[in-house]
Amino acid sequence: MDLFALLRAGVRSGDTPDIGGLTDDRWRELYTAASSQGVSALVWDGIRRLPPESQPSRELRLRWAYNVERIERRYGQQRRRAAELAAAYAEAGIRTVVLKGLAVSRLYPVPEHRPCGDLDCFLCG
């Protein structure tokens, strides 16, 4: 339930997760679960809405923040590659429509935190 509360707070602006008093072990479990499900950046957004005394240890926050930075860099790389690909197709007279991951990420409070895998696009032409 804690993972879902944090995830919900991460994708809904204004929501504050109703959790508190979690042990270090429980926070590590949440980190592992969020990472394995590909939602660690979204859960991080929920954690940042918690009062400082309810957040995980400094050590885990630093580890989590580093992971989120890595996700943000990857997102930036994906956006640049998608733009390069669309430009190459446009040069050949083919219009490109980006689908799913990158396109849907624009609907999230922090688009860079929406997990994206591969690039799905539709070629018109």
Residue locations for each model-derived region?
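Charged, compositionally biased N-terminal leader segments and the immediate start
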Residues: 1-11
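Helical scaffold of the NTase/Pol beta-like nucleotidyltransferase catalytic core
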Residues: 12-100
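Active-site nucleotide-donor binding segment shared across nucleotidyl transfer reactions
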Residues: 81-125
